[in-house]
Amino acid sequence: MKSSKRKICQVLALLVSSIGATAAMAAGPVIQGGGSSLVAPTLGSVSNTATEIGLYGTANATFTYYSVGSGAGQNAFLNNQPTFFGAGVTGTVHFANSDAALSTAQLTAYKAGLGTTSGPLIQIPYIVTPITVPVVNGPAVTSTTTPQTTPGQAHSIALNDNDLCGIFSGKLTNWNQVVNPETGSAYALNAPIKVIYRSDGSGTTELLTRHLAAVCTTLNTQTGVTFVDSLTFTASFPGGAVPANFVAASGSGGVRTQLANLSSAGTSAVAYLSPDYTNTFLAPSSTVVTAAGALQLPVASLVNAKNGAYYAPTYANASTALGTVTPPTTKLLASNPANWVPNAGNPAAGYPVSGTSQIILSQCYANASVKSAVQDFLNKHYTNAGFVSIVHGNGFDTVPSNYQTAISNDFLSNASGFNLDIGNASVCTGTVTGR
């Protein structure tokens, strides 16, 4: 009996020791953020080491990301209101990701309000992204010159700005109205086109409409439609009313689901998505499209009107579209979050619908462990080879090297001497207690 009791005690001791070790491994604060569904598969979760949060682990902190769309992410951060992430979410909003830049009005209001105690807001580019144009049950690909965009398909259907403006405004509603830029003639396919658009506040929408606002005219756009750079797709339509062939979907996942359903039904459809929701040619490591039986969405190549070249929506072509951009070089310029977002609405070269997705942070955090973990995570995101591999595997590119250097010198350290770095003691003091 005594021997049995000793064995039970030994087992209990091992269990307690194991629990203690697990707790130690998961030491540190919970850091939560959310927003852009575009970057959600890249950020991921602690349970998936093929994502940034999973690769980071839980030794210093546990990061949690809610995929709710860029608009909701912005609102969550600007108000420090976690219910924008979900009805039952509580605690502090430590960061947000948004493909759309914050407006001047949003930045001004934050500075005058929550920023007085939380500290200055930081907005920096997180990744470079193309916005793809998936096409299901579209015209047969007959080209021998357009680039590959889809697994098992050497070439792609091609679209130009007139096609994009016509389709996304409702002027062109059948493939036999859409002109093939290679031949100058309409596609032969007689099939009505469904257009899938984001119903939520979407940075993916903002990147698309930024381009459409730059290139669409009264000649190639449906009467009454004027594209505006907005997170809300319907903002470009009179009274917010879209044509009957348009179908709303919430989140990038919702758009993909609609396309998959229409593909199975034999219905032709066009949409806009980040590469990680499309196929494994563009995003070979995406957790969305690597699952067994996952649909590989066909994607169009686009003509760049400035140089006449056809581009696939690869991360390299998105970086080409960004061009030679320079980050802010003085303290006055660098202290304005609006100056950190490059504009590639109508690029001279590269894939025409490209841009950056941003991460939004606070300069001051009340918990020193949160501050340290946020800095550590961002350092790894921008410089660690494993993190870079995850970014590329989801179809995105890292920000230009001059931006990486400036971000490191200005925000992740104080090498620049601008006192903009996270947790700077001369800023995060007194009534500025941090969030």
Q: What do these predicted ranges mean?
A:
Residues 1-26:
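Gram-negative bacterial Sec-dependent N-terminal signal peptides
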Residues 26-435:
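Flexible loop/hinge segments at secondary-structure junctions
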